From Swiss-Prot:
Keywords attached to this entry: Coiled coil
Entry coiled-coil feature ranges: 73-132
Keyword Calcium: no
Protein name as catalogued: Protein FAM167B
Gene transcribed to yield this protein: FAM167B
Pfam families membership: FAM167
Membrane-spanning segments: none
Length: 163
């Protein structure tokens, strides 16, 4: 959320609720447009449980303390236990994804290093080839090193022979 969209209003004004409702409606519309759905099995189980007959019967009989009273759960403790289990599963998934992202980052870094080394080696090979093929470069070095018996081709290969 950018700072340009923030509006400061007095406490108790209802415009904030309307904006929240509008943003929720826009998120729901975007979700429907992109056909996004939650694929977590626990969420699907919960929605099936909520939409089941036991839930509808509990809605029809407004008796407090009855089974299925709290969002399709028998009691608050069972609802909290389900929520804790879900959070533990989500934390495990988060750790797994974080490890996967770190491995991908390391692989990407390794690939970048390999590519940089390969490009550097190509530049060195190209410069060496230019020195070998350039006619003036060999003549400039020839008088200085000819008395030692060094040739132009042997200098670039780093092997020195006597003539």
């Amino acid at each position: 959320m950018s700072l340009g969209l923030l509006k400061f209003q007095a406490v108790g004004e209802e415009d904030e609720e309307d904006e929240e409702g509008e943003s929720l409606d826009s998120v729901k519309a975007l979700t429907a447009k992109l056909q996004l759905q939650t694929r977590r099995p626990s969420y699907l189980e919960w929605t099936a449980q909520v939409q089941s007959q036991a839930w509808r019967r509990a809605q029809a009989k407004p008796g407090p303390g009855g089974p299925g009273d709290i969002c399709g759960f028998d009691s608050m403790d069972s609802a909290l236990e389900w929520l804790r289990r879900e959070l533990r599963e989500m934390q495990a998934q988060d750790r797994q994804l974080a490890g996967q992202l770190l491995r991908l980052r390391a692989q990407l870094h390794r690939l970048k290093m390999d590519q940089a080394c390969h490009l550097h080696q190509e530049l060195l090979d190209e410069a060496e080839l230019e020195l070998e093929l350039e006619p003036g470069a060999g003549l400039a070095l020839a008088p200085l090193l000819r008395h030692l018996g060094l040739t132009r081709m042997n200098i670039s290969a780093r092997r020195f022979t006597l003539c």
